[in-house]
Amino acid sequence: EEKNKEIVDSINYAKRIQDAMMTSEGYRKSVIPKSFTFFKPKDVVSGDFYWVYKDQQENIFFTVADCTGHGVPGAFMSMIGTSLLNEIIVEKGIKDTNKILDEMRKQIIKSLNQDTEDDQKDGMDISICKLNMKKKTLEFSGAHNPLVVVSENELSTFKGDSQAVGLETVDIKPFTKHSMKLKKDDMIYIYSDGYQDQFGGDNGKKYMTANFKKLLLKI
């Protein structure tokens, strides 16, 4: 019982560290006032994370990521992810969304010594956006994860590249950047696979992506 208490205490402390590294609600709302997050981890600590940053050129970067592993292993990867975003965007000043993901992948492979295809395939699926409200422009890059834009009640999906941020058996290719102009009242959504992968309802089936997109149209 004492051992179990130590483990629980350690996990709760890890949650405090993880929470401290994620973007606070106050900062997010100050940067993107009409925004929301829905974050309900299955475990105390999570492999999913989100991050927001506004630079001096009025560019707002926001990202949602889903790291390999659940619970504690996923949480460790999420902390690596938030640290790398700070290093790449804030310190190094890399601003193109595709180059940010290229650099993240390079750093993760290097930091986890993923030199060969036989090594552990740790990494993350991620969506990253760069929004400029004055110019009404949006750039997006994704590793597996998509971007959804709802404009005039029409939903458009921009797919991420079919590769993770990490080492995979497929040939590594540079990430793609999607650029678009936004209209007034457009809604932008990025998300992990958690919501649509939920089992439930009368038949205990997966919620699925199609139902999730219908839900987004109702918001």
Residue ranges, per PLM feature:
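C-terminal catalytic subdomain
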Residues: 178-190, 195-219
